[in-house]
Amino acid sequence: MFGRVVSGLVLVVGLVVAPPALADSGPPTAKFPPGFLWGVSTSGFQSEGHFPDSNWTRYADRKAPGVTDPYGDSVDFLHRYPSDLKLAKGLGVNVFRTSVEWARVEPRRGHRDPKALAYYDDLVRRIKANGMRPMLTLDHWVYPGWVADQGAWDNPRTRDDWLRNARYVVDRYKGQGVIWITFNEASAYIYKELTTRPMDLGQMLKMRDALIKTHRAAYDMIHKVDPGALVSSNVAYGTALNGIFDAAMFNDVTDKLDFIGIDYYYGANLQNLTAVHSLTGEFWKIDPEPEGLYYVLKNYQRRLPHLPVYVVESGMPTDDGKPRPDGYTRTDHLRDHIYWIQRAMADGVKMMGYNYWSLTDNYEWGSYRPRFGLYTVDALTDPTLARRPTDAVPAYRSIIAHRGVPSGYVPVRAPGWCSIEDPVATCLGTTPT
């Protein structure tokens, strides 16, 4: 998942960041190119259910800060993945992102669970059989209970243990066209650990250094074991994080990325400061800022012009599946963001792919209330865990089939004035249209 709370905490910092101005490109005319990667994202822990001992099962069991709902069996992807993959195939996507969970693969040090391996083997096989490319995350914020017992990232041994497990997983799935993500949103990973277990500044810095060193080692290992594979680590949110977290982490791994992975959910401008709701976990109260994605993409492309850009996660939460009070639908949100990606492409951004978060609703780090799924699931009240399509299912299918929104599309949500993503251009210049 994503660093939504982290983003909210540093919105003010973003006002001092000045990424490139919005060019007057007009409505998009170019379609997404053939071979563009359209996908859906999820993570193992958040969707699988029936989860072994881990840091996050412990956080859920003890109701750590931010945890309001029991984990239960989540949406039972562990047993329903064959039918869920059919739903993904029906969208027309060609990428399916999930995570190979260390806690499931190695529930005890040195012991690999054959049932877990059989599950992941079949999952990867079925992803490919359904015409999709696997995007596999090696660490989506979850580690085994025995790693927690040894001090997690406070203990230097964890880095070696992590790399040993990663080598095993990469060895197992090499040569299958996997796109590898080492760490999901490393800076948000640190923040989430900080908010769920006691950590002091020294521990935070130790974890930061460990994640940087581990990613760098993993990048080299993956290219040795799986030559030609694409490897990255996705960055949470975008330019509002640059002032703090990019300086602390992203800048230390830019030479070990094959593409720029971006997760974008919301921005802010002087007409829209609703991102403060991220501090309370009420993400559905945030008014989306689709045009902010344009600035984020342009900014990262400017910084790393030799790399293509992939939106690894993007989506919109609703309050337990209820319609937004302002009438802005999941379809509106999806189309508006695709529009701004096409604007960015028209202005030179080398887009590689786009993943929607998520295929189904899932466990959002302590709560089932935020609903992000293209297919909604009542995890707490429906024992059948039925997948019910939202309005965005046919919309995404049409976008993929027609390679974008049509020429002349006008965003439902108009750009705001004085965006945090580009304060110089948007506060002093003309509001984009």
Identify the function of each model-found stretch.
Residues 25-61, 118-325, 332-432:
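Active-site region of glycoside hydrolase catalytic domains
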Residues 1-23:
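Secretory targeting and sorting signals
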Residues 72-73, 111-112, 207, 285, ...:
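A generic structural signal for short
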Residues 63-71, 101-104, 197, 276-280:
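Short glycine/proline-rich turn/loop motifs
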Residues 76-101, 133, 303:
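Catalytic domains of carbohydrate-active enzymes, especially glycoside hydrolases
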Residues 20, 41-43, 99-103:
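Acidic/polar N-terminal loop/beta-strand segments that form early-domain functional surfaces
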Residues 91-118, 136-139:
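Aromatic-lined carbohydrate-binding/catalytic grooves of carbohydrate-active enzymes
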Residues 66-80, 156:
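Active-site mouth loops of central-metabolism enzymes
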